[in-house]
Design a protein with these regions (language model features):
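N-terminal accessory segment detector
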Residues: 1-109, 114-132
Length: 135
């Protein structure tokens, strides 16, 4: 494994300590912190309920982010989706690989490599990445 600097811009406000990337405030937390919270909520609510909540919230957030980035960079169509997948890949969730995309149907087949969930939880025998489906 080789190391590299982050590929996305990170700005830190010297007064507030707020991190910003792509003009959005960000949180920088350890992977285990996020995953442990995710697993605890899943256990409390059940996978189906939690997956639905995550889908709806993720869809809303992804739509908002894509609109803002498309406007900022003059992107349209598939280019917006590709930019989004690239940015997700640069943030440590894993490497998102688009295998197929049908803009007319509004569908895509995406493979996730190097998932943060698998790195933290190991192979569990079930799909852990359902939180990304709304994204």
């Amino acid at each position: 494994m080789t190391a590299m600097a982050p590929e996305l811009p990170i700005y830190v406000d010297s007064e507030t300590g707020v991190w910003t990337t792509d003009a959005l405030p960000m949180l920088y937390v350890p992977r285990h912190f996020f995953i442990n919270n995710h697993v605890a909520i899943e256990q409390a609510l059940g996978v189906e309920t939690y997956a639905k909540i995550l889908y709806d919230a993720g869809y809303k957030s992804a739509w908002y982010w894509c609109e803002k980035e498309a406007e900022l960079h003059g992107l349209e169509g598939v280019a917006v989706f590709e930019h989004y997948m690239n940015r997700l890949s640069q943030r440590g969730w894993g490497k998102f690989v688009t295998e197929a995309i049908d803009l007319e149907a509004g569908t895509a087949k995406v493979r996730l490599e190097h998932s943060c969930f698998v790195y933290q939880l190991g192979k569990t025998g079930k799909r852990e990445e359902y939180m990304f489906t709304g994204w």
